[in-house]
A protein has these predicted regions:
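Structured binding elements
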Residues: 156
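Conserved small/polar residues in nucleotide/adenosyl-binding loops
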Residues: 196-201
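A short N-terminal helical cap/helix-turn-helix that marks the beginning
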Residues: 28, 36-50, 67-92
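Conserved AMP-binding/adenylate-forming core of the ANL superfamily
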Residues: 22-26, 73, 87-150, 167-172
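Proline-aspartate-enriched helix->loop->beta-strand connector
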Residues: 179-180
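Short hydrophobic alpha-helical segments of the AMP-binding
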Residues: 148-153, 202
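ATP-dependent adenylate-forming carboxylate-activation enzymes
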Residues: 139-140, 160-176, 188-195
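N-terminal amphipathic, basic-rich helices that act as targeting or association modules
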Residues: 1-49
Length: 206
C-alpha cells in the first residue's frame, strides 16, 4: 500500500501519506482516476487499448476497460525471466507431511512453472478447450492447481475449482451449473497424516 501511495504522489501528484480514509474516499468517488491508476501501477498489458475505464456503471452489468484484452496468465508469466534472474522462486509450498517432519518448503522455479503451464495448455487445446470454455478442477491447494489455473487462463477459458474435502453432492451441484468441457482431478488427499483416496468421488463425478 505504501508503495502505491508513493507512486500516486510521484506519478499523479496525489499525496495521501498515511491517510487511508482519504485514499479510500478517492478510490470510491473518482472511479475512472483510481482504476486507471491501478492499471498503470501494475503495468497491465493489452494487445488492444481500452477506450474508457468504466463505460457503464450499472450494477450488475458494469463494463470495465472496454476494448482491452487482459490475460491473467500472461500478466503473471511476463515476470518469469526477471524473477528467475533475481533468484526468486515462482511457487513455495508445504504439504502436511513436510510440515510434520520439519522439512524445508518445496520450490518451483519460474522456467519450470512456465514449462508445465505450456504443456498443460497444449493438452487442454488438444481436448478442444478454447476461449469461454469451462475447466473444472477437483484439487487441493497444491502447485498443480496453480499450473492448471494458469494453463486454463492462458487459453481464455474459465477456471472453477472445488477442494476434495467438499462433499461430492456439493461439488456436483457447482460443476453441473457451468457444464465444464474438461475435469482435472486428484486421486487422493492427505489429511491428519492419513491418505484418503477419491475413488468414490471420482465415480460420482464421472
Amino acid at each position: 500500500m505504501q508503495a502505491y501511495r508513493s507512486w500516486l504522489a510521484q506519478e499523479r501528484g496525489l499525496a495521501f501519506d498515511a491517510d487511508y480514509q482519504a485514499l479510500w474516499h478517492w478510490s470510491v468517488t473518482e472511479l475512472d482516476a483510481f482504476w486507471q491508476s491501478i492499471w498503470d501501477y501494475f503495468e497491465l498489458q493489452s494487445p488492444t487499448p481500452h477506450t474508457a475505464v468504466l463505460a457503464d456503471d450499472r450494477m450488475p452489468g458494469a463494463v470495465w476497460f472496454p476494448g482491452a484484452q487482459v490475460n491473467y496468465a500472461r500478466q503473471v508469466l511476463r515476470h518469469a525471466d526477471a524473477a528467475h534472474a533475481a533468484g526468486q522462486p515462482a511457487l513455495v509450498s508445504h504439504n502436511e507431511q513436510s510440515l510434520a517432519e520439519g522439512r524445508a518448503a518445496a520450490e518451483m522455479s519460474w522456467p519450470e512453472l512456465r514449462r508445465q503451464v505450456a504443456a498443460l495448455a497444449l493438452h487442454l487445446q488438444d481436448q478442444g478447450v478454447g476461449r469461454g470454455d469451462r475447466v473444472a478442477a477437483y484439487l487441493p491447494n497444491v502447485p498443480a492447481a496453480v499450473v492448471a489455473l494458469l494453463a486454463t487462463a492462458s487459453l481464455g477459458a474459465v477456471w472453477s475449482v472445488c477442494a476434495p474435502d467438499m462433499g461430492t453432492d456439493a461439488v456436483l451441484d457447482r460443476f453441473r451449473q457451468i457444464e465444464p468441457k474438461v475435469l482435472i482431478a486428484c486421486n487422493g488427499v492427505v489429511y491428519a497424516c492419513l491418505l484418503y483416496t477419491s475413488d468414490a468421488a471420482d465415480d460420482s463425478l464421472r
